[in-house]
Amino acid sequence: MIMMAMNATDLQAQGVVPAQKGEKTFTLEDLNFGGNNYRNMVAKNRWCTWWGNELVRQDVDACYLVNKTTGKETRLFGINDINQWIAPTKDIKVRALYNALFPFAGKSIVMVSNGSKTYTVDFKKHKLLSEMEFADGENLLEANAQQNAFAYLKGSNLYVRTFDVTSNALTKEKKSHDFQISNDGSREIVYGQSVHRDEFGISKGTFWSPNGELLAFYRMDQSMVTDYPQVDIPEIGFNHPETQSCIATPAPDKYPMAGETSHKVTVGVFDCMTGKTVYLKAGDPTDRYFTNIAWSPDSKTIYMFELNRDQNDCRLTAYNAETGEKTGELYRETDEKYVEPCHPIQFLPWDSNSFIMQSRKDGYNHLYLCTLGKHGSRMASNTESLEIKQLTSGKWEVMEVLGFNTKRKSII
């Protein structure tokens, strides 16, 4: 606002360099919202999404893979392709690709929707994998890798919809079945969503097992957290005063201020084959963070980093996914200042007994190869049963593990 009130002389006096010969000098009409030329200067909207670490531009009639270095685009598929793969003999199902999602890094799977229906397509195999319909108030959270089970929210409660699970004890026929996992969901009891204020790398609240039969999920009780006063301000261009007030309305948020009472989080596991849910027996959740949930390759064990609220004591623990029993503490890291786990462990595709762990214990985020000892994850507190070897080192940071080269047995 101060800059808007300044003239050209004021700008030069404050250190703005005049345009050199051949360069355009911007005016307030170019830069100020509402200026005569402002609309021509604003960058055009581009709909983009991520496919793992790859950037995809979504357009009305096609999706393009964007080279992050050069900006060059490569067409992945078009709207006509999608409709042909979905239903070659029927009317058009999808009319735009703005909402296309790529849920699995490294897999050629795209999810597109049209109204209440969502289609999952393999765009390399040119094949429809699944088709499902969501009613009003139902929001898809995550599908399993097999595309035969979907976690979704209905209101504030968590559900799972399964398809073609012939061995399911509750669904013998090849049809869909809905399981209601929770019935006490509310503004204060939150299911299947990101917890702990999105800290420690947490960005979601559901985690499918590799075999697609088990769903781990967060349950957050924030009834004890004080409301933080905020307001909902109508969008610019609001033009329906006859049906809704244009005045800001209260929209309090549950925010645990420093030193105040925090929420309590637990981790549940739903079994699609039995329809039963168990909760991990992690003890009293008061002033504790449960972060970076990961599955073992055989879908029998859940791993997570547990952290105290002071954030100076972090433990990698293991739980039996069927019973919820704690089976071991694999690793412990403490620090006088803080510990910040931000990445779940990642098992090697060629060795189900070894995984990659990321830690900043030497001052920089680096990779460590961890191998379970002869006792596996069944030891009580014997951290010596985990062999740890530092893979990277130096005064630089590992930003992300992009994947594995199984032929060369290397990490990317």
Go through the PLM ranges and name each one:
Residues I2-D10:
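C-terminal segment of classical bacterial N-terminal signal peptides
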Residues M1-I2, I412:
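Accessible peptide chain termini
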Residues Q12-I412:
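Beta-propeller folds
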